[in-house]
Design a protein with these regions (language model features):
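Terminal, low-complexity, charged helical segments
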Residues: 3, 13-16, 105-112, 119, ...
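Charge-rich, acidic-biased intrinsically disordered regions
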Residues: 52-64, 155, 397-416, 474-480, ...
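Short acidic (Asp/Glu) and glycine-rich catalytic loops that position anionic groups and cofactors
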Residues: 96-101, 349-360, 428-438, 478-487, ...
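Generic, well-ordered alpha-helical scaffold segments in large soluble proteins
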Residues: 121, 125-128, 369-389, 414, ...
Length: 640
C-alpha cells in the first residue's frame, strides 16, 4: 500500500471531504489575482490601439482625473493621431501575406504516406474551425497584449461531434505565476473562467432530471454577493471584496471555473522488452499487468525448456507520477466534473504563448511605442492650442484717428465686413495709422519635434514606410525600396516566428486529438479537388508519430500560377497527358473539361459517336473497321 499522503487527490478527499473544492478555488483565485497587472496593461494597450488614447489617469490637486477630462476643463481639445493602429494593421498584413500552414511529416520514412494523409486531415479540421481568421485575430491579440491562448477540445457543437478550437480571452484565463520557462513546460496550474447560459450549462453537465434540479438550485444564489461571501467565510476563505473571480459581470450568466493542475500519485513505469512498449500503470493494476504476465511468460519458458534469463520479462520501477487533473467548479465549491486528463497527449487542452517571457515578464509589441504615441498626441494638441491662442488679424486703431459719429464697435463691424470702408481722422504728427497685427507663434520647433517622434515611432516599431506600402522619395530605386521592406521584415522576424511556434503547438494538439478521437474511417476532401481526396484509417495512423512544420501554403495565387506554368511546360513537351494537366493543375474550367474528355473516351470505347468528331471519322468508328481511325480520335482528344 502506498504511504498516506502520496496520492494528492485521495488525500484531499480524505482530509477535506466535501470542502476540498474550496482549496482548489482559492488557489485558482490567487493565480487569477496575480494576473491583475497584466489585465490592466492589456486594457491600456487595447485602448491605445483602438483610439482611446487619453484615458490614462493623472493626479491633480490630490484628485484622480482622466487626461481627456483635464484637457477639456482647460478649454482645449484632446486631439490624437492614431499611429499604433496603422502599425498593427501593417504587421497583420505581413502575417496574412505569408499564408503559412502546418504540415505533418512522419518520423519514420516508411510511414510518410500517412504524414501526407494527416496533413490533409489537419487542413480539413482547420477549415472547419476557420483557423485562418482565428489565427489572424490571435495575432492581433498577440501584438496588443503579448499573450495569446487557444483551447483545443473534442465534443459536440452545432450537432457535430469533432475536434474544435476556441479563442480564449486572456482576461478570463489564469496560469501558474511561478512559471518561468517560455515554453510553458514548468506550468503546474492553468484554468479559465466560463460565463455561459443556463441552457449551455445543463447541456454540458446535466445527465438526467436530478442533475438539472441540482444545477438550478446551485445557480439560484450565484448572483447574490452576500450569499457568496458568507459561504466562503464559513469555510475559512474570506473573499475580501474580490468578487470578479466568482460573480459574472452579466448576472444572467452562469459562472463555471475550469481548473487544470498537476496532481501526484505513486505509479509503476513499465518497459515490455518483448515489444519495446514503455507505459505506466497504477499500483492497483501491478499484479494483473506485470506480475501475472511475467509469471505466465516464465511458465511458458519452462515448458519449452528455455533458460529463465533469456525470457523477455516486463521491467518496472516505482515512481511518483505528476499528472494533469481537471476540476469543473461552481462559485460555491460544487464539483460539477473532475478526473484525470482524458486526452492521450496527457496534458491540458490549452495552448498559450507569452512574449518575450524573459524572467516571466510580458512586454507586448504595442507597449513599446505608447510613449511615442503619447508625445505625438501632446505635440498635436499643443500645436492646435498655440495656433488658436496666437493673434490673428488684430486691428490696432489709435483713438485720435476715430472720426466723429463712429464708435469702436462700428469700426470693428466695418473691419469684419467684406469690402468694408473705415473713415479715419487725419492723425497728428507722430501718431501712427491704424494697422493690423498678425503674430506667427507656430514656428517654435513643434514641427521638428513631431517629425522626430514619427521617425522614432518607425525606428522603435521596425515598421517603416516601405513596409506600410508608402511611396518612396523621388529617384529611389526599386531595389533600395525592396531592401528597406526586407530589412523591416527582418526586424519583425522574431515576433512572427514566435507566433508560428504557437500555431505549431496548437497543430500538435490537434493532431493528437485527431489520432485519439477519429476512431472510424473517414474520407476527407479539401476545396473539392479530386487530387486531395484521402481516406483516413485510424488503425494505421493512430500510433504514428508526426513532426510538424510551418510551411508556405499551397493555396496562394502565386503558388497556383507557378504550378500551372510548370504543368503547361510539361504538357507542351508531351511529358504529361491533358488529363494529368487538368487533374493536377488549378484551372477554372478543369473539372468540367476533364469530365467531358472522360465522357468522350467512354463513348469511343463503346463504339458510339462522340461530340466534336468529323462525320467521316465517326462512320469509321461505328463500323469499327479502321484501327488507325481510333488512334486518330485518341490523338484529337489528347491535343484538345
Amino acid at each position: 500500500m502506498p504511504h498516506e499522503g502520496m496520492d494528492s487527490v485521495a488525500t484531499a478527499k480524505h482530509t477535506l471531504g466535501g470542502n476540498r473544492a474550496f482549496e482548489v478555488l482559492w488557489q485558482a483565485q490567487q493565480y487569477w489575482l496575480a494576473m491583475d497587472t497584466f489585465r490592466r496593461d492589456r486594457e491600456r494597450n487595447k485602448n491605445y490601439t483602438y483610439g482611446r488614447q487619453w484615458d490614462d489617469y493623472v493626479c491633480v490637486n490630490g484628485r484622480k482625473i482622466r487626461e481627456e477630462e483635464l484637457i477639456k476643463k482647460q478649454g482645449n481639445v484632446p486631439l490624437k493621431n492614431n499611429l499604433i493602429r496603422r502599425m498593427v494593421q501593417a504587421v497583420l498584413g505581413i502575417y496574412r501575406s505569408q499564408a503559412k500552414e502546418p504540415t505533418c511529416t512522419a518520423r519514420d520514412r516508411d510511414e510518410q504516406r500517412y504524414g501526407e494523409t494527416m496533413s490533409t486531415v489537419l487542413q480539413c479540421n482547420m477549415q472547419l474551425n476557420r483557423m485562418t481568421e482565428i489565427n489572424a485575430r490571435c495575432m492581433e491579440e498577440f501584438l496588443i497584449s503579448g499573450f495569446v491562448v487557444q483551447r483545443k477540445w473534442y465534443g459536440w457543437r452545432e450537432n457535430k461531434l469533432d475536434c474544435w478550437t476556441d479563442y480564449v480571452q486572456p482576461n478570463n484565463f489564469f496560469i501558474d505565476n511561478n512559471m518561468k520557462d517560455f515554453r510553458g513546460w514548468d506550468c503546474s496550474c492553468v484554468g479559465e473562467v466560463h460565463d455561459i447560459s443556463f441552457e449551455e450549462l445543463c447541456g454540458r453537465f446535466a445527465k438526467d432530471g436530478n442533475d438539472y434540479n441540482r444545477l438550478a438550485e446551485i445557480y439560484k444564489f450565484a448572483k447574490d454577493k452576500s450569499y457568496l461571501s458568507a459561504t466562503f467565510d464559513n469555510f475559512g476563505y474570506p473573499l475580501q471584496g474580490y468578487y470578479d473571480f466568482l460573480v459574472p459581470y452579466d448576472t444572467s450568466r452562469c459562472r463555471v471555473i475550469e481548473v487544470w493542475r498537476k496532481e501526484s500519485k505513486p505509479r509503476v513505469r513499465c518497459h515490455d522488452v518483448n515489444n519495446g512498449d514503455v507505459f505506466k500503470i497504477d499500483i492497483e493494476d501491478f499484479q494483473a499487468i506485470v506480475t501475472d504476465e511475467n509469471n505466465k511468460r516464465l511458465q511458458e519458458a519452462r515448458e519449452l525448456g528455455m533458460d529463465e534469463s533469456d525470457v523477455p520479462l516486463i521491467r518496472w520501477e516505482w515512481f511518483m507520477d505528476s499528472y494533469w487533473y481537471y476540476y469543473m467548479l461552481t462559485p460555491f465549491g460544487d464539483i460539477l466534473e473532475e478526473g484525470e486528463t482524458p486526452y492521450e497527449h496527457k496534458s491540458h487542452p490549452y495552448v498559450f504563448k507569452a512574449y518575450p517571457f524573459i524572467d516571466g515578464e510580458i512586454h507586448s509589441f504595442v507597449s513599446n511605442v505608447i510613449d511615442q504615441q503619447r508625445y505625438t498626441n501632446r505635440l498635436i494638441t499643443m500645436y492646435d492650442w498655440i495656433m488658436r491662442a496666437s493673434a490673428k488679424g488684430v486691428l490696432l486703431f489709435p483713438e485720435d484717428c476715430l472720426p466723429k459719429g463712429m464708435s469702436m464697435d462700428d469700426v470693428a463691424d466695418e473691419w469684419a465686413r467684406f469690402n468694408g470702408i473705415i473713415m479715419i481722422r487725419t492723425p497728428k504728427a507722430g501718431t501712427p495709422l491704424p494697422q493690423q497685427i498678425a503674430n506667427n507663434c507656430t514656428q517654435i520647433g513643434i514641427s521638428e519635434l513631431l517629425n522626430m517622434q514619427l521617425k522614432f515611432f518607425e525606428d522603435i516599431s521596425g515598421v517603416n514606410g516601405a513596409l506600410q506600402g508608402k511611396p518612396g522619395y523621388s529617384g529611389m530605386s526599386a531595389s533600395l525600396y525592396n531592401q528597406q521592406a526586407q530589412n523591416a521584415s527582418t526586424s519583425l522576424l522574431d515576433l512572427l516566428d514566435t507566433f508560428s511556434s504557437f500555431v505549431k503547438e496548437g497543430a500538435y494538439k490537434d493532431v493528437k486529438n485527431i489520432q485519439q478521437f477519429y476512431d472510424t474511417p473517414r474520407v476527407f476532401n479539401i476545396a473539392g479537388k479530386n487530387s486531395t481526396i484521402v481516406e483516413y484509417d485510424p488503425k494505421k495512423i493512430r500510433d504514428v508519430e508526426f513532426d510538424l512544420s510551418i510551411v508556405e501554403s499551397t493555396a496562394t495565387p502565386a503558388y497556383r500560377a507557378l504550378t500551372n506554368d510548370m504543368l503547361m511546360q510539361l504538357w507542351e513537351k508531351n511529358a504529361i497527358s491533358v488529363e494529368q494537366l487538368l487533374e493536377h493543375g488549378d484551372f477554372p474550367f478543369a473539372d468540367e473539361l476533364l469530365q467531358s474528355i472522360k465522357s468522350q473516351r467512354e463513348q469511343l470505347e463503346q463504339g458510339k459517336v462522340p461530340d466534336g468528331i468529323s462525320p467521316e471519322l465517326a462512320q469509321q468508328v461505328q463500323q469499327n473497321a479502321n484501327a488507325s481511325a481510333m488512334q486518330q480520335a485518341q490523338q484529337m482528344l489528347q491535343a484538345s
